[in-house]
Design a protein with these regions (language model features):
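Long amphipathic alpha-helical segments used for membrane anchoring, targeting, substrate engagement
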Residues: 1-30, 79-101
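Residue-level signature of catalytic and energy-coupling elements of molecular machines
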Residues: 10, 46, 70
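N-terminal intrinsically disordered, cationic/polar leader segments
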Residues: 26-57, 61
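Alpha-helix boundary/capping detector
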Residues: 36-39, 50, 68, 72, ...
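Active-site- and interface-proximal helix/loop "cap" or "latch" segments in soluble metabolic
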Residues: 52, 56-83
Length: 101
């Protein structure tokens, strides 16, 4: 493959990644913990869209439990978003040197 073909392919890959990123900005995933007591909705940009806390989970005598539930819900949302990114980028991820997460 000559250098011009390589540059053309690189530009095509960059354009595809930009389109996928634009699509991902519209995606939202939901992380859940405690059987639904805590839910966190995360945008494709990894920005938190919303947090739901069931009143049952809010016990001022057990704040560490609530903290653990929030952390678990966030981590669940991040894992789902990473999986979504991998699925959308697919083979482009390896061509672009991997994903930054």
């Amino acid at each position: 493959m000559n250098p011009f073909d390589i540059m053309k392919n690189a530009k095509e890959i960059q354009a595809k990644i930009a389109n996928i990123k634009s699509d991902l900005d519209q995606e939202v995933v939901e992380g859940v913990s405690g059987g639904g007591l805590v839910k966190i909705r995360l945008k494709g940009s990894f920005e938190v869209e919303s947090i739901f806390l069931d009143p049952i989970a809010v016990d001022n005598r057990d704040v560490p439990m609530l903290q653990d539930l929030v952390r678990a819900a966030y981590n669940d949302a991040v894992a789902k978003l990473k999986e979504l990114l991998q699925n959308k980028l697919g083979p482009l991820a390896s061509l672009a040197g991997g994903l930054p997460f």
